[in-house]
């Protein structure tokens, strides 16, 4: 007689540190996600909550509306800038580092006042640009007043 199978086993793993947000960051850079879902085989506890919380706070600070890539908005090609325009509430920028390395980039912006979308703090600007340093696969969101 055949031995009974002992059940089902699965192992879910994630990349270490900021690299744990690679899938989410690339989805944000290349599309218009309005939800984030995970396919896991068991309970899902993130090993690097600092990066997950930072990403989620910035993701949730953006309106769930279509965005478009702003060509050449960042001085570094690995930084993708997506823009969401509204009729009444200004615009939002989603700035994503798609690189495996930390990056510093100048971001072009046509607004007169730019604020961090998560906390409302002003982002210093010079001549229609601001400088931003991002760790690998980091998302930062900004609101532009009009």
Regions found by a protein language model. Name each.
Residues 1-106:
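Active-site-proximal substrate-binding groove within the catalytic cores of carbohydrate-active enzymes
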Residues 59, 95, 122, 140-145:
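Short beta-strand element of the conserved SAM-dependent methyltransferase core
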Residues 81, 95, 107, 114, ...:
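Hydrophobic beta-strand residues in large extracellular and virion-surface proteins
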Residues 87, 99, 111, 136-138:
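Short loop/turn positions at the edges of beta-strands in beta-sheet-rich folds
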Residues 90, 116-119, 129:
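A general secondary-structure boundary signal
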Residues 102-122:
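Beta-strand-rich binding/interaction modules
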Residues 126-146:
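C-terminal beta-strand-rich structural cap/linker in extracellular carbohydrate-active enzymes
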């Amino acid at each position: 007689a055949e031995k009974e199978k002992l059940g089902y086993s699965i192992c879910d793993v994630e990349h270490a540190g900021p690299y744990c947000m690679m899938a989410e960051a690339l989805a944000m850079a290349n599309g218009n996600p309005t939800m984030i879902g995970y396919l896991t085989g068991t309970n899902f506890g993130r090993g690097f909550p600092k990066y997950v919380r930072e990403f989620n706070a910035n993701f949730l600070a953006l309106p769930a509306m279509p965005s478009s890539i702003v060509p050449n908005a960042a001085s570094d090609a690995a930084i993708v800038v997506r823009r969401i325009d509204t009729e009444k509430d200004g615009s939002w920028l989603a700035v994503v580092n798609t690189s495996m390395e930390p990056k510093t980039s100048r971001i072009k912006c046509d607004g007169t006042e730019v604020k961090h979308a998560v906390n409302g703090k002003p982002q210093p600007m010079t001549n229609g640009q601001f400088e931003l340093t991002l760790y690998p696969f980091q998302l930062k969101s900004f609101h532009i007043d009009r």
